[in-house]
Curated annotation (Swiss-Prot):
Protein name: UvrABC system protein C
Cited HAMAP family: UvrC (MF_00203)
Gene responsible for this protein: uvrC
Keyword DNA damage: yes
UniProt-annotated location(s): Cytoplasm
UniProt-listed GO biological process terms: nucleotide-excision repair; SOS response
Family: Belongs to the UvrC family.
Organism: Lacticaseibacillus casei (strain BL23) (Lactobacillus casei)
Main location, first listed in the record: cytoplasm
Record keyword DNA-binding present: no
InterPro entries in the record: GIY-YIG_endonuc (IPR000305), GIY-YIG_endonuc_sf (IPR035901), GIY-YIG_UvrC_Cho (IPR047296), RuvA_2-like (IPR010994), UVR_dom (IPR001943), UVR_dom_sf (IPR036876), UvrABC_protein_C (IPR050066), UvrC (IPR004791)
Amino acid sequence: MASAHIEHKLSLLPDLPGSYQMKDINGKIIYVGKAKNLKNRVRSYFKSSHDGKVAAMVSQVADFDFIVTSTDKEAFLLEITLIQKYQPYYNIKLKKGTGYPYIKITHERDPKIEITGTIRKDGGYYFGPYPNVYAAQETMHFIQKVYPLRRCNGYQGRPCLYYHMGQCLGACFRTVPEKEYTDQIERIKRFLNGNVGKAKASLTAKMERAAKNLQFERAAEIRDQLHYIEQTVEKQKIISHDNTTRDLFNFYMDKGWISIQVFFIRQARLMKRESRLFPVVNTAKEEFESFILQFYSRKNNVKPREVLVPAALDNKVLADILEIPVRTPQRGEKRDLMALAAKNSQIKLEDKFRLMELDNRTTIGAMKELMAALNLPMGHVAEAFDHSHIQGADPVSAMVQFVDGQPAKNNYRKYKLDADKTHNGADEAANTREVIRRRYTRLLKERAPLPDLILMDGGEIEMNAAKDVLENELNLDIPVAGMVKNNKHKTAALLFGNADQLINLDPKSQGFYLLERIQDEVHRFAITFHRQLHAKNSLASRLEGIKGVGPKTRLKLLRKFKTINKIKEAPLEDIQELGISKKVAQALKLSLTAEPTPARRV
């Protein structure tokens, strides 16, 4: 079953072609795919049953991302590029090998056309990469027939077979003029860059002629050849035909937010994409220019040979600061890429707004469910409390606040309990009375708003202790419920009412999910605070009995090392740097070697 986060993102997928990237819980890309329709393809992973490797992959997906393209063919080539870049685990298993073909015109006196899997700086012309080896080969064979160069091994004193077939210019028996090669190479370059109109028209005429003459096999061959050419040669916006390293920036702004896309073009391919979203303080132009400059001020950031930006920016100023050319594409492939980045920026920001709206509906709905389960009117603010101590030592309490189902972390509070003075730190009822008294006495004194619901981690002891203070000491009427856990220490139900009624929520409901979040969050907050306090107090108490370590020295040690283990592991020289003599430093390390067995934390 997909998580709520993934369900929300699935509902926002566009009906457009593109590449999608599946990520695990650590944000690592584990699978890259392509789709003619992103919505249908990505949803199919989570809405259908699978087995084998697909099921294994889906079980690890914690998030996904996508890049919209103009055509499904661009999605195919982008998928190739991303697989080569990230080497995702499941792609490597499902698609062995990462070599994809290029069509190459060699740099020789008598050049030839060939298929290669490697780009070298040898002066040759490279076109690709292409997704289909067979299609690339068929296109190359077509070029050899229509735009022949050299197909033989060179001069041999007599015409080769390919010359007689019209597929070689004759380097096998004569000196071919360089201009003849140059003109032919220009025709091939135009063809491979997408200018295939004349060639396709010629093939179509041949196919129709063959069909008219009942040469159906020949007509079918030509039809397949046309298909291969369309599949392989059609110009791609994602792929650039030169090797200049470029970074392309574009943005979209709406409702006080700016969405920025950065396309990294390396080795003639889109190698990486970064997305950024943040609220706008200045104008979009100022924010965007500031982002670009900060982008290259990051540590270890390597600048490209060229930066591409949309119109209306101060290109000269940016170029002067970055010390590299900053240009705005006016036509062709680069302008199309710029438009694609703008489109992805808009989709990213619109997705954020929709997710915010969905999250808002979900969390408000969850709070409404929680209040309804307790037969209470709709409320907005819930405060939850939990205690932590080790067999009564270093007792603390923590309070977290949720507003409309969302954590309000600025309103979280931590309390060191006065257990040594007033009660046993292991007394859960006394701990509850103290923290409830302190929290709501303070709110009354400050005339601050009171919560609509108080949740106590635990059971009837904590719940009734809280109610006792609120009703009998502070004269407050705030509903209090206990968050009950099962024997696996997981959220199970609520305890509420004068009769300590057990109220079960639907485990699949948003209300139950919110209750789990609140209980986990307050427990985490309390435990973290207790660990910090206990470590500090344990270190201080261990240091008190060591001869030569007075209050000032203890303070220095606490500030520098913070834990006993760090002092034990520290070289004597580090301890002596605090102004401690070698003799005292040695006594200190010796005294700390015997650690007491830690007691259970609750």
